[in-house]
């Protein structure tokens, strides 16, 4: 592994993959910027570190979260993956829940004050302690392997393979869960306006519903993508929560603070050929927000949203995710690109089979 050269005694929590490996054992010179950025999790200022894996590398790697938040979750400050398993926090917690037999979830606070409070409180979150101990990693992997080879996972002695193939809607724990009050408020029948339909100074296009969110896409990446499109982070308002992402429900929402920026956001989506899709079956338009290699669908939400818009309990959020998956499959099958100028298919003409001529038998 490459060696670090730091300007101070404090050592950041960075995984080996981010530091990189080198056959020449060259040193990595790490630049330190006190209070150089705001943590992506707790929003508090922290000491920013940035470096290159090698002198020839053109990529600059920098820390995204503070060391306190990284230690609480046992993740790398740069890639935000588990320090030992190199997987996302959500996936790690799911695997550790299977091994331990009890649910361990890293609950993230919704408002800024609680995020700061949790960061200053210290301690460990979720299954961080399980993967922090190097000696327990092998035992964890062995237990996980035994579980995956067909041992019962729940009280009903249902094997993992059956759970994976089982539809979420048929889960006995979710059958009695009612999500209709939430579902009725989702703007799934709304359409993303085209450039001509965008009104000037209209407050009805300031809130947006966003769905098809993969669990590996963190909230801050979505927020940064919106900031990138608008060229400013002033869309976030202090009066209300600007963005809420519920990964269990595979959806969320964001609110743009003023009319000028909301109009700019609508225009930006419309002016890009690959950021609008149209459903062939019903003509509904969906905006597309591209984060990494994922496509997140956007619809204006005239009614607005709150923290409880995506389920008050984990089971409600899970059932919302299942219902949205069915919608996504249906919409993905019916979507076409904005520039798709294919002509409507003509009705195929009826093909009549030619009547076979009877061949007279000839006696020889």
Curated annotation (Swiss-Prot):
Annotated GO MF terms: pre-mRNA binding; U6 snRNA binding
InterPro entries: Cwc2/Slt11, Slt11_RRM, STL11/RBM22-like_N
Cellular compartment(s): Nucleus
Bias-annotated ranges (Basic residues): 346-364
Residue ranges of the region described as Disordered: 339-364
One annotated Gene Ontology cellular component of this protein: U2-type catalytic step 2 spliceosome
UniProt keyword terms in alphabetical order: mRNA processing, mRNA splicing, Nucleus, RNA-binding, Spliceosome
One GO biological process term: mRNA splicing, via spliceosome
Residue stretches in coiled coil: none
Principal location listed in the UniProt entry: nucleus
KW Transcription regulation (keyword) present: no
Keyword RNA-binding: yes
PANTHER family per the UniProt record, alphabetical: PRE-MRNA-SPLICING FACTOR RBM22
Function per UniProt: Involved in pre-mRNA splicing. Facilitates the cooperative formation of U2/U6 helix II in association with stem II in the spliceosome. Binds to RNA.
Subunit structure: Associated with the spliceosome.
Family to which the UniProt record says this protein belongs: Belongs to the SLT11 family.
Protein name (database record): Pre-mRNA-splicing factor SLT11
Organism in which the protein naturally occurs: Candida glabrata (strain ATCC 2001 / BCRC 20586 / JCM 3761 / NBRC 0622 / NRRL Y-65 / CBS 138) (Yeast)
